[in-house]
Amino acid sequence: MEVLWYLTGPDGRYPWRADGARKLSYAYFQQLARAVDHLGYTGALLATGSHDAWIQGASLIPYTEHFQHLIAAHPPLLSPTLLAKMIATFDQFSKGRLRVNIVNGDAKLMAQYGVHLSHDERYAYTDEYLTVLSALLRGETVNFRGRHIHVVDAGVPLPTVQRPHVPLWFAGSSPAAYEVAAKHIDTYLSWGETPEQAETKVRAIKALAANHGRAGKISFGIRLYVIVRETEAEAWAAAQDIYDHMDEKAIIGAQAYVAGIDSIGQQRMSALHGGRKPKDLRELEIAPNLWAGIGLVRHGPGTALVGSAKQVLARIQDYRDAGHEVLIVSGMPLLEEAYRFAELVLPHLPVDRRAEAGVTSSFTKDRDAAWQKIA
């Protein structure tokens, strides 16, 4: 399987608070990327945030060796021809270490960039966009006239390192999103709903993909926060500390922002906690070790796996049993929790940890023997 970390701010122990947020710098991102690379993760997601994900990712190529960059791209903000050229250039310079996360966004975010399309119009746009982009990445010369996109003799002179093309990833919870994923996407991502809810998506998209002649062509991933400690009690104590720092102002602000978003995925995340902060944080444990409290102060994915290493591994197995072989995880703060997850959980997952090639055999033997005690 593949396990990716996260490389986008804000960051800190309580990043929704001024006194809990970490100052981000290029040097810090270098440090974080090197850590992710060395610790044996597959790579990391560079999502939409304060920094431009493409410039950030390109600047980190020289500081990593195995790190796969999963970089977000919003179709309405770049022509498909320009994005294809960016992808080919990045793939060549990184020697094949790129995946592209196609992000449909929401009306509120897109309006900030001057794009005013309804929910279904955005997916219709993305459908046309990916038709053109995929052909360009295959090396074709493209002439296409659609409702939203019209290109004439479009082509990219640079071949990609990865064949037949750089992998395209995608997330979305509406019927329109499912259709786009089924037609075009290599890896479909879900935010951290319960394994049962996530499996329902897997089945729906597999059925649609088969209708498009793409049976078996799509892999599936899940995006989660993680709060893992050596014992369950320690993990829930850490979650309690995070919960105690969720002040009313932060919750009201976050919930006011997501209330106006037309993203179905965001609406499904918000429904898990209902915008309320009960006295007992365990009331937001929506499934074993799956806690929805993060969504009170963060938009986007808002659930965390909370527990001991053994419990977190069991819950990851639940998602694998539901058809997910890609895991994107993060913790707060990003750097410290990347090390913690790599120590407690990552060695027990079937990940190709190529970055460990230079580690001495005595170290790995001692480490593996130690981990057998908690497996």
Protein language model annotation of sequence segments:
Residues 1-66, 145, 161-166:
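N-terminal beta1-alpha1-beta2 module of alpha/beta enzyme domains
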Residues 3-7, 43-46, 67-73, 98-102, ...:
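Hydrophobic faces of well-ordered beta-strands that scaffold small-molecule active sites
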Residues 7-27, 47, 72-81, 120, ...:
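Active-site mouth loops of central-metabolism enzymes
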Residues 34-38, 57-66, 87, 91-98, ...:
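Acidic (Asp/Glu)-rich catalytic clusters
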Residues 36, 40, 60, 90, ...:
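Conserved, mostly hydrophobic/aromatic
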Residues 76-92:
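Glycine-rich anion/phosphate-binding loops
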